[in-house]
């Protein structure tokens, strides 16, 4: 007796070629679809929901397959031509191949899915994503790396002709490769003046025979180029990270930059490090020209930003984000507001103009000092900053004893979300309202589930797109204590 075809088990093997339609995004930059038989497939490649693709299976699991896309047979209507010629080789942008409208739609779905599936929130009020005014050239900070191993483009490998020397590169690390760097002339997320510095430094380094850093051998002079730009004050910071200090060389670079960009207000720094890593910071800092910092304006506040300070990388959208905190939090002039994970105090100070007192809490001592300096710079007397570990409730309680209890708490934790003990500390303070600022929808959902279990209800979630062309999304979620 023969088993009907529809009842026979379909057996997939490694190396099989399958066809499927991409239906959604998945973790680790993969996409998801199903075979005609209904088997789920995680597909690697530069894809978009709506793409019809052929893919080769490389791993067979009991409940799903993993495959690599071979060819897009029918393109998604969301697709556009990427403006960057090295998109796909550079790891900076993940979604430049789809329209900005589609990016916003994907991000809204990601926030909604996380809150529903991880947080257990039924039909959460996820508002339309607040789009960035500029989808390109929006970053106020960019870090470029220098290497003696240039990442070769596939076109060079196929033609067996090098477009540039293999032993010098200044640009971004190739995805998953800490040694090789993709040499760039232009980053389409960086400001125009940043790209000009990138090319001036490359020409200067090659002319002078400066040795690029070799990460594996821990040899070489030129390591990184870190740039910051103040949109409101039009100031540019150029920070060169090297393995040792060469005063004459830095002076020559200063003169080259000033000759190439005579109208640009600029400060030049040299961070020096002997560490065996590729991080763009140094143990020593030399100010070659200018003040050694830039000043940026958010709203009616000025913030002094040094080479290694944290500051939101999208100035215009940072204002949008902070305005949303005030709006969804319902902050009034009579309120005492606590700002957890306050860093250098940007949110705390932004809130201070709208409430009676704003108290910032941060574990990093240097960040607290920067926050206090920024409060003084702006003449704010209703702010207080504490260096404290949020995981220690009793120490927190003792430090905050002289101050009014908060009606509202704002928390802006790192990407990993709140430590369980820090979350417990926040909930023990029993604010009427919690405004949770998150750059990771999954961890917002995880922490939000615990907040809801402790007597709060989520009233809204407002996504804000801080990073166009990428799959990252910021969200401002509001939780109110149930009566």
Swiss-Prot record:
Binding annotation for [4Fe-4S] cluster? 84, 90, 93, 187
Broadest EC class?
transferase
The record ties this protein, via CDD domains, to:
AdoMet_MTases (cd02440)
This entry's Enzyme Commission designation comes to 2.1.1.-
Pfam families, A to Z:
TRAM, tRNA_U5-meth_tr
Which top-level group of life is the source organism from?
A: Bacteria
Q: Which residues form the active site?
A: 439
Biological-process GO terms, alphabetical: rRNA base methylation
Please list the residue ranges annotated as the TRAM domain.
11-71
Metal-binding: is it a keyword of this entry?
Answer: yes
Any idea which UniProt keywords this protein has?
4Fe-4S, Iron, Iron-sulfur, Metal-binding, Methyltransferase, S-adenosyl-L-methionine, Transferase
- GO function term, MF aspect, one: metal ion binding
Which positions are annotated as binding S-adenosyl-L-methionine?
Answer: 312, 341, 362, 412
What family is it from?
A: Belongs to the class I-like SAM-binding methyltransferase superfamily. RNA M5U methyltransferase family.
PANTHER family, A to Z: RNA M5U METHYLTRANSFERASE, TRNA (URACIL(54)-C(5))-METHYLTRANSFERASE
What NCBIfam families does the record point to?
rumA (TIGR00479)
Indicate what this protein is called per its UniProt record.
Uncharacterized RNA methyltransferase CT0009
- Name its species: Chlorobaculum tepidum (strain ATCC 49652 / DSM 12025 / NBRC 103806 / TLS)
């Amino acid at each position: 007796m023969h088993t009907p075809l529809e009842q026979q088990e379909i057996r997939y093997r490694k190396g099989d070629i399958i066809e499927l339609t991409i239906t959604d995004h998945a973790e680790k930059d993969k996409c998801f679809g199903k075979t005609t038989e209904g088997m789920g497939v995680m597909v690697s490649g530069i894809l978009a929901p709506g793409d019809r693709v052929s893919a080769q299976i490389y791993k067979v699991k009991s409940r799903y397959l993993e495959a690599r896309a071979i060819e897009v047979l029918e393109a998604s209507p969301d697709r556009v031509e990427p403006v960057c010629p090295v998109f796909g080789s550079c790891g900076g942008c993940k979604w430049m191949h789809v329209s900005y409208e589609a990016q916003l739609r994907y991000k809204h779905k990601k926030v909604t899915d996380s809150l529903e599936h991880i947080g257990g929130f039924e039909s959460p009020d996820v508002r339309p994503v607040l789009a960035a005014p500029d989808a390109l050239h929006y970053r106020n900070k960019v870090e470029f790396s220098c290497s003696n191993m240039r990442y070769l483009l596939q076109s060079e490998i196929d033609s067996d002709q090098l477009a540039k020397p293999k032993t010098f590169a200044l640009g971004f690390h190739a995805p998953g490769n800490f040694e090789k760097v993709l040499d760039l002339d232009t980053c389409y997320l960086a400001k125009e003046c940043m790209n000009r510095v990138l090319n001036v430094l490359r020409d200067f380094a090659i002319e002078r025979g400066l040795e690029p850093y070799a990460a594996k051998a821990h040899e070489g002079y030129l390591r990184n180029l870190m740039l910051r730009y103040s949109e409101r004050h039009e100031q540019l910071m150029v920070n060169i990270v090297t393995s040792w200090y060469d005063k004459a060389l830095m002076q020559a670079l200063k003169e080259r930059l000033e000759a190439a960009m005579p109208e640009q207000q600029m400060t030049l720094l040299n961070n020096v490090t002997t560490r065996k890593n590729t991080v763009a910071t140094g143990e020593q800092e030399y100010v070659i020209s200018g003040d050694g910092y830039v000043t940026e304006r958010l709203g009616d506040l000025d913030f002094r930003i040094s080479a290694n300070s944290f500051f939101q990388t999208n100035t215009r959208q940072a204002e949008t984000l902070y305005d949303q905190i005030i709006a969804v939090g319902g902050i009034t002039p009579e309120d005492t507001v606590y700002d957890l994970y306050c860093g250098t105090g940007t949110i705390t100070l932004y809130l201070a103009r709208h409430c009676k007192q704003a108290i910032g809490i941060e574990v990093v001592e240097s960040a607290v000092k920067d926050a206090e300096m920024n409060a003084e710079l702006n003449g704010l007397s209703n702010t207080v900053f504490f260096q404290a570990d949020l995981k220690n409730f009793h120490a927190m309680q003792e430090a905050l004893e002289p101050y009014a209890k908060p009606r509202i708490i704002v928390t802006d934790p790192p990407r990993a979300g709140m430590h369980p003990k820090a979350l417990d500390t926040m909930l023990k303070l029993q604010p009427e309202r919690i405004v949770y600022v998150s750059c990771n929808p999954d961890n917002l959902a995880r922490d939000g589930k615990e907040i809801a279990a402790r007597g709060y209800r989520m009233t809204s979630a407002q996504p804000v797109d801080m990073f166009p062309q990428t799959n990252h999304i910021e969200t401002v979620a509001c939780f109110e204590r149930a009566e």
